[in-house]
């Protein structure tokens, strides 16, 4: 299990549509960071830098996703309950959850 703690969102982050675009942009940046990690192979310094970048970009993805939810629902969104439901769906599909 990964615990991300409380996530602060950008108050003036734009409309829900703008926030949805931001989420896609951040996800693309996370994928690009992974590509750099995948290409680094035997360069330990590059691997270390790429690992840090992946972590930073994933944090941006989480922040953007929570910002989108907040822009639509505001306040206490029930996201914790939705995460539990998502976990159950994945388990029902035979995916091993850690």
Question: What role is predicted for each listed range?
Answer:
Residues 1-98:
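Flexible "arm" and connector segments at domain edges
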């Amino acid at each position: 299990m990964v615990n991300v703690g409380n996530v602060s969102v950008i108050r003036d982050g734009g409309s829900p549509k703008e926030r949805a675009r931001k989420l896609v942009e951040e996800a693309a940046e996370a994928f690009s960071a992974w590509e750099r990690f995948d290409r680094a192979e035997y360069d330990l310094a590059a691997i270390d830098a790429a690992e840090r970048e992946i972590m930073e970009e994933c944090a941006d993805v989480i922040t953007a996703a929570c910002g989108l939810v907040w822009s639509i629902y505001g306040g206490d969104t029930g996201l914790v309950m939705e995460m539990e439901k998502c976990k159950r769906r994945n388990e029902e599909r035979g995916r091993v959850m850690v």
